[in-house]
Swiss-Prot record:
GO terms for cellular component: plasma membrane; protein N-acetylglucosaminyltransferase complex. Keywords: Cell membrane, Membrane. Belongs to the GtfB family. This is UDP-N-acetylglucosamine--peptide N-acetylglucosaminyltransferase stabilizing protein GtfB. Pathway: Protein modification; protein glycosylation. Required for polymorphic O-glycosylation of the serine-rich repeat protein (SRRP) in this bacteria. A stabilizing protein that is part of the accessory SecA2/SecY2 system specifically required to export serine-rich repeat cell wall proteins encoded in the same operon. The GtfA-GtfB complex adds GlcNAc from UDP-GlcNAc to the substrate protein, attaching the first sugar residue. Stabilizes the glycosylation activity of GtfA. Has no N-acetylglucosaminyl transferase activity on its own. Forms a heterotetramer with 2 subunits each of GtfA and GtfB. Part of the accessory SecA2/SecY2 protein translocation apparatus. It is found in: Cell membrane. The gene is gtfB. It is a peripheral membrane protein. InterPro entries: GtfB. Its main location: membrane.
Protein backbone atom coordinates (compact mmCIF):
# COMPACT_ATOMS: atom_id res chain seq x y z
CA UNK A 1 0.00 0.00 0.00
CA UNK A 2 1.28 3.45 -0.93
CA UNK A 3 0.22 7.10 -0.85
CA UNK A 4 1.14 8.65 -4.21
CA UNK A 5 0.63 12.41 -4.47
CA UNK A 6 1.38 14.70 -7.42
CA UNK A 7 2.39 17.51 -5.06
CA UNK A 8 2.62 18.00 -1.34
CA UNK A 9 -0.06 20.67 -1.27
CA UNK A 10 -2.51 21.46 1.51
CA UNK A 11 -4.84 18.60 0.57
CA UNK A 12 -1.98 16.08 0.62
CA UNK A 13 -0.78 17.47 3.95
CA UNK A 14 -4.28 17.13 5.43
CA UNK A 15 -4.69 13.58 4.16
CA UNK A 16 -1.32 12.45 5.47
CA UNK A 17 -1.78 14.19 8.83
CA UNK A 18 -5.19 12.56 9.19
CA UNK A 19 -3.63 9.15 8.60
CA UNK A 20 -0.91 9.83 11.17
CA UNK A 21 -3.48 11.05 13.72
CA UNK A 22 -5.42 7.82 13.23
CA UNK A 23 -2.20 5.81 13.75
CA UNK A 24 -2.24 4.65 10.12
CA UNK A 25 1.27 4.37 8.70
CA UNK A 26 1.51 4.12 4.92
CA UNK A 27 4.64 4.99 2.89
CA UNK A 28 4.19 8.28 1.04
CA UNK A 29 5.73 9.36 -2.26
CA UNK A 30 5.40 12.81 -3.85
CA UNK A 31 6.07 13.01 -7.59
CA UNK A 32 6.98 16.72 -7.81
CA UNK A 33 9.49 17.53 -5.08
CA UNK A 34 9.74 21.28 -4.38
CA UNK A 35 12.62 20.71 -1.97
CA UNK A 36 10.67 21.15 1.25
CA UNK A 37 8.93 17.81 1.69
CA UNK A 38 8.61 16.57 5.28
CA UNK A 39 11.43 14.20 6.28
CA UNK A 40 9.12 11.17 6.30
CA UNK A 41 7.84 11.80 2.75
CA UNK A 42 9.81 10.27 -0.12
CA UNK A 43 10.37 11.32 -3.73
CA UNK A 44 12.54 10.30 -6.68
CA UNK A 45 14.64 13.45 -6.19
CA UNK A 46 15.28 12.76 -2.50
CA UNK A 47 16.17 9.15 -3.26
CA UNK A 48 18.76 9.82 -5.96
CA UNK A 49 19.94 13.11 -4.43
CA UNK A 50 20.85 11.35 -1.16
CA UNK A 51 21.00 14.63 0.75
CA UNK A 52 22.40 15.04 4.25
CA UNK A 53 19.21 15.38 6.29
CA UNK A 54 21.02 16.91 9.28
CA UNK A 55 21.60 20.22 7.50
CA UNK A 56 19.30 23.25 7.77
CA UNK A 57 17.55 25.44 5.17
CA UNK A 58 19.59 28.25 3.65
CA UNK A 59 19.04 31.58 5.39
CA UNK A 60 18.81 34.50 2.98
CA UNK A 61 21.99 36.29 4.06
CA UNK A 62 24.05 33.11 3.56
CA UNK A 63 23.62 33.27 -0.22
CA UNK A 64 26.96 33.52 -1.99
CA UNK A 65 27.13 36.80 -3.95
CA UNK A 66 29.76 38.79 -5.86
CA UNK A 67 31.55 41.46 -3.85
CA UNK A 68 29.54 44.64 -3.25
CA UNK A 69 26.24 43.05 -4.27
CA UNK A 70 23.55 43.37 -1.63
CA UNK A 71 20.24 41.88 -0.55
CA UNK A 72 17.14 43.89 0.33
CA UNK A 73 14.56 41.79 2.12
CA UNK A 74 11.15 41.88 3.75
CA UNK A 75 9.43 39.07 5.61
CA UNK A 76 7.82 37.92 2.36
CA UNK A 77 10.60 38.09 -0.26
CA UNK A 78 14.06 39.40 -1.07
CA UNK A 79 15.89 41.05 -3.97
CA UNK A 80 19.55 41.00 -4.98
CA UNK A 81 21.08 44.24 -6.27
CA UNK A 82 24.32 45.18 -8.01
CA UNK A 83 24.41 48.86 -7.06
CA UNK A 84 20.97 50.00 -8.27
CA UNK A 85 20.39 47.20 -10.78
CA UNK A 86 18.23 44.30 -9.62
CA UNK A 87 19.89 40.99 -10.44
CA UNK A 88 17.57 38.45 -8.81
CA UNK A 89 14.41 37.86 -6.78
CA UNK A 90 14.53 35.61 -3.72
CA UNK A 91 11.47 33.46 -3.01
CA UNK A 92 11.11 32.25 0.57
CA UNK A 93 9.60 28.97 1.67
CA UNK A 94 7.13 30.87 3.87
CA UNK A 95 6.09 34.46 4.54
CA UNK A 96 6.45 34.16 8.32
CA UNK A 97 9.76 36.07 8.50
CA UNK A 98 11.90 32.90 8.71
CA UNK A 99 13.46 33.90 5.34
CA UNK A 100 14.42 30.36 4.32
CA UNK A 101 15.46 30.42 0.67
CA UNK A 102 13.43 28.28 -1.73
CA UNK A 103 14.28 29.89 -5.08
CA UNK A 104 16.59 32.55 -6.46
CA UNK A 105 15.29 33.83 -9.80
CA UNK A 106 18.22 35.35 -11.68
CA UNK A 107 17.37 38.08 -14.18
CA UNK A 108 18.89 39.04 -17.52
CA UNK A 109 19.64 42.61 -18.59
CA UNK A 110 16.01 43.03 -19.64
CA UNK A 111 14.72 42.10 -16.20
CA UNK A 112 13.37 38.71 -17.35
CA UNK A 113 14.12 35.39 -15.65
CA UNK A 114 17.25 33.77 -17.08
CA UNK A 115 17.49 30.82 -14.72
CA UNK A 116 16.28 29.71 -11.28
CA UNK A 117 18.34 28.16 -8.50
CA UNK A 118 16.17 25.85 -6.40
CA UNK A 119 17.10 25.15 -2.76
CA UNK A 120 15.78 22.44 -0.46
CA UNK A 121 15.09 22.12 3.26
CA UNK A 122 18.65 20.93 3.81
CA UNK A 123 20.23 24.03 2.26
CA UNK A 124 21.37 22.36 -0.98
CA UNK A 125 20.97 23.97 -4.37
CA UNK A 126 19.30 20.82 -5.59
CA UNK A 127 18.07 22.00 -8.99
CA UNK A 128 18.44 24.67 -11.66
CA UNK A 129 15.86 25.64 -14.26
CA UNK A 130 17.05 27.39 -17.43
CA UNK A 131 14.81 29.65 -19.50
CA UNK A 132 14.60 30.12 -23.26
CA UNK A 133 12.39 32.79 -24.82
CA UNK A 134 11.02 33.57 -21.34
CA UNK A 135 9.84 29.96 -20.87
CA UNK A 136 11.36 27.19 -18.70
CA UNK A 137 13.22 24.87 -21.08
CA UNK A 138 15.65 22.64 -19.16
CA UNK A 139 16.12 21.53 -15.56
CA UNK A 140 19.07 19.85 -13.86
CA UNK A 141 18.97 18.09 -10.50
CA UNK A 142 22.05 17.86 -8.28
CA UNK A 143 22.95 15.35 -5.57
CA UNK A 144 24.62 16.13 -2.25
CA UNK A 145 28.03 16.24 -3.95
CA UNK A 146 26.76 18.79 -6.51
CA UNK A 147 26.78 16.23 -9.34
CA UNK A 148 24.01 16.23 -11.93
CA UNK A 149 22.00 13.01 -11.64
CA UNK A 150 18.86 13.94 -13.58
CA UNK A 151 18.11 16.25 -16.53
CA UNK A 152 14.62 17.16 -17.65
CA UNK A 153 13.81 18.56 -21.08
CA UNK A 154 10.84 20.68 -20.07
CA UNK A 155 9.81 21.26 -23.67
CA UNK A 156 9.91 17.67 -24.93
CA UNK A 157 9.05 16.20 -21.52
CA UNK A 158 11.71 13.47 -21.46
CA UNK A 159 14.34 12.67 -18.79
CA UNK A 160 17.96 11.53 -18.65
CA UNK A 161 18.88 9.73 -15.43
CA UNK A 162 22.62 9.39 -14.82
CA UNK A 163 22.45 6.37 -12.49
CA UNK A 164 23.83 2.85 -13.04
CA UNK A 165 25.04 3.59 -16.55
CA UNK A 166 22.24 5.97 -17.47
CA UNK A 167 18.59 5.72 -18.52
CA UNK A 168 16.31 7.65 -20.81
CA UNK A 169 12.61 8.02 -19.99
CA UNK A 170 10.13 9.49 -22.49
CA UNK A 171 7.89 10.89 -19.75
CA UNK A 172 7.62 11.69 -16.06
CA UNK A 173 5.24 8.76 -15.60
CA UNK A 174 7.84 6.28 -16.89
CA UNK A 175 10.47 7.80 -14.59
CA UNK A 176 8.14 7.46 -11.59
CA UNK A 177 7.34 3.85 -12.49
CA UNK A 178 11.05 3.03 -12.59
CA UNK A 179 11.58 4.74 -9.24
CA UNK A 180 8.70 2.86 -7.58
CA UNK A 181 10.05 -0.45 -8.85
CA UNK A 182 13.61 0.44 -7.80
CA UNK A 183 12.41 1.26 -4.28
CA UNK A 184 10.43 -2.03 -4.11
CA UNK A 185 7.27 -0.41 -2.76
CA UNK A 186 4.21 -2.61 -2.42
CA UNK A 187 2.03 -1.44 -5.29
CA UNK A 188 -0.99 -3.64 -4.65
CA UNK A 189 -3.06 -0.69 -3.45
CA UNK A 190 -2.26 2.95 -4.22
CA UNK A 191 -4.01 5.95 -2.69
CA UNK A 192 -3.82 8.93 -5.06
CA UNK A 193 -5.57 12.29 -4.84
CA UNK A 194 -5.61 13.86 -8.31
CA UNK A 195 -6.87 12.92 -11.74
CA UNK A 196 -3.53 13.91 -13.24
CA UNK A 197 -0.13 12.29 -12.61
CA UNK A 198 -1.26 9.96 -9.83
CA UNK A 199 -4.00 8.57 -12.05
CA UNK A 200 -1.57 8.21 -14.98
CA UNK A 201 0.83 6.17 -12.86
CA UNK A 202 -2.03 3.96 -11.68
CA UNK A 203 -3.19 3.35 -15.26
CA UNK A 204 0.34 2.33 -16.29
CA UNK A 205 0.93 -0.23 -13.52
CA UNK A 206 0.01 -3.94 -13.74
CA UNK A 207 -3.76 -4.36 -13.76
CA UNK A 208 -3.97 -6.66 -10.74
CA UNK A 209 -3.90 -3.81 -8.20
CA UNK A 210 -6.79 -2.16 -6.38
CA UNK A 211 -6.39 1.61 -6.14
CA UNK A 212 -8.40 4.40 -4.52
CA UNK A 213 -8.90 7.99 -5.64
CA UNK A 214 -9.38 10.42 -2.75
CA UNK A 215 -11.10 13.37 -4.41
CA UNK A 216 -10.71 16.69 -2.56
CA UNK A 217 -11.32 19.30 -5.26
CA UNK A 218 -14.69 21.10 -5.28
CA UNK A 219 -17.15 20.08 -7.97
CA UNK A 220 -18.56 22.57 -10.42
CA UNK A 221 -22.25 21.96 -9.93
CA UNK A 222 -23.14 18.29 -10.25
CA UNK A 223 -20.81 17.66 -13.20
CA UNK A 224 -18.09 15.07 -12.56
CA UNK A 225 -14.60 15.55 -14.06
CA UNK A 226 -13.97 13.78 -17.35
CA UNK A 227 -11.25 11.49 -15.97
CA UNK A 228 -13.55 10.44 -13.14
CA UNK A 229 -16.17 9.50 -15.69
CA UNK A 230 -13.48 7.48 -17.48
CA UNK A 231 -12.89 5.47 -14.30
CA UNK A 232 -16.62 4.86 -14.01
CA UNK A 233 -16.92 3.71 -17.61
CA UNK A 234 -13.87 1.44 -17.76
CA UNK A 235 -12.40 -1.39 -15.74
CA UNK A 236 -9.11 -0.13 -14.25
CA UNK A 237 -7.04 -0.61 -11.10
CA UNK A 238 -9.12 2.12 -9.46
CA UNK A 239 -11.92 0.37 -7.58
CA UNK A 240 -12.90 3.12 -5.13
CA UNK A 241 -13.53 6.87 -5.31
CA UNK A 242 -13.68 8.59 -1.93
CA UNK A 243 -15.05 12.14 -1.78
CA UNK A 244 -13.40 14.37 0.81
CA UNK A 245 -15.69 17.41 0.65
CA UNK A 246 -18.76 17.01 2.80
CA UNK A 247 -20.95 19.45 0.89
CA UNK A 248 -20.29 17.76 -2.47
CA UNK A 249 -20.90 14.31 -1.01
CA UNK A 250 -24.18 15.40 0.61
CA UNK A 251 -25.36 16.86 -2.68
CA UNK A 252 -24.57 14.04 -5.11
CA UNK A 253 -23.39 11.02 -3.13
CA UNK A 254 -26.74 9.23 -3.13
CA UNK A 255 -26.88 9.34 -6.94
CA UNK A 256 -23.44 7.82 -7.56
CA UNK A 257 -23.87 4.19 -8.53
CA UNK A 258 -21.49 2.34 -10.82
CA UNK A 259 -20.35 -1.18 -11.69
CA UNK A 260 -16.63 -0.37 -12.01
CA UNK A 261 -16.05 1.72 -8.87
CA UNK A 262 -17.76 2.22 -5.54
CA UNK A 263 -18.09 5.57 -3.80
CA UNK A 264 -17.73 6.80 -0.25
CA UNK A 265 -16.92 9.80 1.92
CA UNK A 266 -13.95 10.44 4.19
CA UNK A 267 -13.03 13.98 5.14
CA UNK A 268 -10.20 15.30 7.28
CA UNK A 269 -9.12 14.95 10.90
CA UNK A 270 -8.26 18.42 12.21
CA UNK A 271 -6.38 19.13 15.43
CA UNK A 272 -8.33 21.20 17.95
CA UNK A 273 -6.13 21.94 20.97
CA UNK A 274 -8.85 23.96 22.69
CA UNK A 275 -12.53 24.84 22.73
CA UNK A 276 -14.04 28.25 22.09
CA UNK A 277 -14.20 30.06 25.45
CA UNK A 278 -16.48 32.93 24.36
CA UNK A 279 -13.88 35.57 25.19
CA UNK A 280 -14.54 39.02 23.64
CA UNK A 281 -11.20 39.00 21.84
CA UNK A 282 -11.12 39.31 18.02
CA UNK A 283 -8.08 38.73 15.80
CA UNK A 284 -7.13 40.04 12.34
CA UNK A 285 -3.86 38.99 10.69
CA UNK A 286 -3.01 41.15 7.68
CA UNK A 287 -0.22 42.78 5.74
CA UNK A 288 -2.74 45.11 4.12
CA UNK A 289 -4.50 48.20 5.45
CA UNK A 290 -7.56 47.39 3.32
CA UNK A 291 -9.70 46.05 6.16
CA UNK A 292 -13.35 46.24 5.17
CA UNK A 293 -15.71 48.09 7.55
CA UNK A 294 -13.18 47.95 10.37
CA UNK A 295 -14.20 51.32 11.82
CA UNK A 296 -17.85 50.29 11.88
CA UNK A 297 -17.12 47.06 13.70
CA UNK A 298 -14.82 48.73 16.22
CA UNK A 299 -17.50 51.33 17.06
CA UNK A 300 -20.36 48.82 17.12
CA UNK A 301 -18.49 46.40 19.38
CA UNK A 302 -16.84 48.56 22.08
CA UNK A 303 -16.64 45.64 24.50
CA UNK A 304 -14.64 43.49 22.08
CA UNK A 305 -10.87 43.90 21.93
CA UNK A 306 -9.59 43.98 18.34
CA UNK A 307 -6.07 42.58 17.93
CA UNK A 308 -4.60 43.48 14.51
CA UNK A 309 -1.20 41.99 13.65
CA UNK A 310 1.11 42.20 10.63
CA UNK A 311 4.48 40.63 9.91
CA UNK A 312 5.50 43.90 8.20
CA UNK A 313 5.45 47.57 9.12
CA UNK A 314 1.97 49.12 9.28
CA UNK A 315 0.78 52.04 7.19
CA UNK A 316 -0.30 55.32 8.71
CA UNK A 317 -3.89 54.41 7.88
CA UNK A 318 -3.69 51.29 10.03
CA UNK A 319 -1.68 52.92 12.81
CA UNK A 320 -4.44 55.52 13.16
CA UNK A 321 -6.65 52.87 14.76
CA UNK A 322 -4.54 53.17 17.90
CA UNK A 323 -6.91 55.99 18.88
CA UNK A 324 -9.54 53.43 19.85
CA UNK A 325 -9.33 51.96 23.33
CA UNK A 326 -10.53 48.55 22.13
CA UNK A 327 -7.80 48.18 19.46
CA UNK A 328 -4.31 46.74 19.88
CA UNK A 329 -1.85 46.85 16.96
CA UNK A 330 1.14 44.54 16.43
CA UNK A 331 3.40 45.67 13.55
CA UNK A 332 6.33 43.38 12.75
CA UNK A 333 4.70 40.76 14.94
CA UNK A 334 6.85 37.84 16.11
CA UNK A 335 5.92 34.18 15.65
CA UNK A 336 5.67 33.77 19.42
CA UNK A 337 3.22 36.67 19.69
CA UNK A 338 1.09 35.28 16.83
CA UNK A 339 0.83 31.93 18.62
CA UNK A 340 -0.24 33.71 21.80
CA UNK A 341 -2.85 35.79 19.98
CA UNK A 342 -4.31 32.71 18.31
CA UNK A 343 -4.56 31.05 21.71
CA UNK A 344 -6.12 34.10 23.39
CA UNK A 345 -8.79 35.08 20.84
CA UNK A 346 -12.13 33.41 20.18
CA UNK A 347 -13.23 35.37 17.10
CA UNK A 348 -11.38 35.65 13.79
CA UNK A 349 -12.39 38.40 11.38
CA UNK A 350 -11.53 37.46 7.80
CA UNK A 351 -12.23 40.96 6.51
CA UNK A 352 -8.95 42.12 4.98
CA UNK A 353 -8.47 42.40 1.25
CA UNK A 354 -5.24 41.23 -0.42
CA UNK A 355 -3.46 38.01 0.44
CA UNK A 356 -3.92 35.92 3.55
CA UNK A 357 -0.86 35.60 5.79
CA UNK A 358 0.32 32.87 8.14
CA UNK A 359 -2.51 30.49 7.17
CA UNK A 360 -4.61 32.64 9.46
CA UNK A 361 -8.06 31.22 8.71
CA UNK A 362 -6.96 27.60 9.03
CA UNK A 363 -5.21 28.43 12.30
CA UNK A 364 -8.37 30.08 13.59
CA UNK A 365 -10.46 27.08 12.55
CA UNK A 366 -8.19 24.62 14.32
CA UNK A 367 -8.42 26.75 17.49
CA UNK A 368 -12.25 26.62 17.30
CA UNK A 369 -12.45 30.38 16.83
CA UNK A 370 -15.67 31.71 15.34
CA UNK A 371 -14.67 32.77 11.81
CA UNK A 372 -16.67 35.67 10.41
CA UNK A 373 -16.13 37.53 7.15
CA UNK A 374 -17.54 39.35 4.15
CA UNK A 375 -18.21 37.36 1.00
CA UNK A 376 -15.73 39.59 -0.88
CA UNK A 377 -12.87 39.05 1.59
CA UNK A 378 -12.96 35.34 2.41
CA UNK A 379 -9.61 33.63 1.92
CA UNK A 380 -10.59 30.07 2.89
CA UNK A 381 -14.38 29.88 2.42
CA UNK A 382 -14.47 26.16 3.22
CA UNK A 383 -13.84 27.09 6.86
CA UNK A 384 -16.63 29.69 7.03
CA UNK A 385 -20.27 28.68 7.39
CA UNK A 386 -22.98 30.53 5.45
CA UNK A 387 -24.34 31.96 8.74
CA UNK A 388 -20.99 33.72 9.26
CA UNK A 389 -20.74 35.24 5.77
CA UNK A 390 -22.06 38.74 5.16
CA UNK A 391 -22.39 41.26 2.36
CA UNK A 392 -20.07 44.26 2.58
CA UNK A 393 -23.05 46.49 3.42
CA UNK A 394 -24.06 44.24 6.34
CA UNK A 395 -21.51 45.32 8.95
CA UNK A 396 -24.31 46.14 11.41
CA UNK A 397 -25.77 42.68 10.97
CA UNK A 398 -22.32 41.12 11.41
CA UNK A 399 -21.82 43.05 14.66
CA UNK A 400 -25.11 41.78 16.12
CA UNK A 401 -24.29 38.23 15.03
CA UNK A 402 -20.91 38.30 16.79
CA UNK A 403 -22.41 39.65 20.03
CA UNK A 404 -25.21 37.08 19.97
CA UNK A 405 -22.69 34.25 19.63
CA UNK A 406 -20.60 35.56 22.53
CA UNK A 407 -23.63 35.99 24.80
CA UNK A 408 -25.32 32.68 23.97
CA UNK A 409 -23.11 29.61 24.57
CA UNK A 410 -25.60 27.30 22.84
CA UNK A 411 -25.52 29.43 19.69
CA UNK A 412 -21.72 29.57 19.71
CA UNK A 413 -21.54 25.78 20.04
CA UNK A 414 -23.99 25.34 17.17
CA UNK A 415 -21.99 27.70 14.94
CA UNK A 416 -18.66 26.01 15.75
CA UNK A 417 -20.13 22.53 15.23
CA UNK A 418 -21.51 23.57 11.83
CA UNK A 419 -18.20 25.23 10.96
CA UNK A 420 -16.42 21.93 11.58
CA UNK A 421 -19.00 19.79 9.79
CA UNK A 422 -19.00 21.90 6.63
CA UNK A 423 -15.18 21.82 6.64
CA UNK A 424 -15.52 18.03 6.15
CA UNK A 425 -14.26 17.10 9.60
CA UNK A 426 -14.35 13.42 10.56
CA UNK A 427 -13.11 11.36 13.49
CA UNK A 428 -10.18 9.04 14.09
CA UNK A 429 -12.65 6.15 14.15
CA UNK A 430 -13.96 7.13 10.70
CA UNK A 431 -10.42 6.96 9.30
CA UNK A 432 -9.57 3.69 10.95
CA UNK A 433 -12.80 2.13 9.71
CA UNK A 434 -12.47 3.32 6.09
CA UNK A 435 -8.73 2.76 5.64
CA UNK A 436 -8.96 -0.52 7.50
CA UNK A 437 -11.61 -1.77 5.08
CA UNK A 438 -9.45 -0.81 2.10
CA UNK A 439 -6.36 -2.45 3.61
CA UNK A 440 -8.22 -5.71 4.17
CA UNK A 441 -9.15 -6.17 0.51
Amino acid sequence: MLNLFDNFDQASFDFLRSQRTAQIKIPTVVINDDGFLPPEVESPIKYWGNYNVNKKPLYFDHLSLPRYWRILSTAAQGHIYDLDKKRADIIYQATDNTRQVKEVRWLNNNGKVSWIDHYNRYGYRFAQTYYRNEQPAWRKYYDKKNRVFLEWNLIAGDFFLDVDGGYHFPSLIELVKYYLQTRHFKLDHIFYNTLNQGLSVSLNLPADGSDTLFWHEPLSGDELPGNMKFLMENSTRTKHIIFQRYTDWQRIGANLKNNHVDFGFLGTIYPHPRANQLRPQALILTNSDEIVELSTLIKNLPNIKFHIAAVTEMSGKLLAYQQYENVELYPNVSSARVKQLIADCDIYLDINRQNEILDAVRGAFEQNMLIVGFDETLHEPQFVTPQNMFKVNEAQKMSKHIMAALLKPALMKELIDTQRQLASEVSVQDYQRMIGALQSE
